[in-house]
Amino acid sequence: MNGTLIRHALLVAIAVAWAAGAQAQQTRATPILSKDLPDFAGKEVTISTVEYPAGVASAPHRHDAHTFVYVLEGSVVMQVTGAEPVTLSPGQTFYENPTDVHATSKNASATAPARILVFMIKDKGMRATRPAN
């Protein structure tokens, strides 16, 4: 009886630790600036950084924006639907147009974090990211 109880408690502890680790391993966006563009009715610019822990990838998504990416540190793999994936290093850039589906967005390294700067021109008040579907 005690052995079964201990095994169950151990399994629950492992499951909780795994779930906490999985939650911690996500990209993290930090907004830097959001500014209306008065010369472009209904448009705004947003600038943010996105951090990718080692080995982390985001699910396919859309931005519905002109999206410019600049790699600050580490290496990332980016791909829009219909194009080949590209691996980018610090100082390199990537562009998505408003109709693109961002099929791949991941840290190229399983051991080191990566960080990018993202500059978007989008419809004012619209979410920066939404699921691809």
Identify what each model region corresponds to.
Residues 42-47, 66, 83, 99, ...:
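Extracytoplasmic
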Residues 65-82, 90-92:
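Glycine- and acidic-residue-biased ligand/ion/polar-headgroup-sensing regions
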Residues 60, 78-79, 96, 102-109:
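Short beta-strand His + acidic residue motifs that chelate non-heme Fe in jelly-roll/DSBH
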Residues 85, 100-125:
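Ligand-binding loop in jelly-roll beta-barrel domains
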Residues 37-41, 52-53, 82-99:
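Short acidic-glycine-tyrosine-enriched beta hairpin
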Residues 2-46, 79, 94-95, 113, ...:
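A short, N-terminal "cap"/entry segment at the start of jelly-roll beta-barrel domains
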Residues 33-65:
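N-terminal targeting signals for Sec/Tat export/insertion, comprising classic cleavable signal peptides
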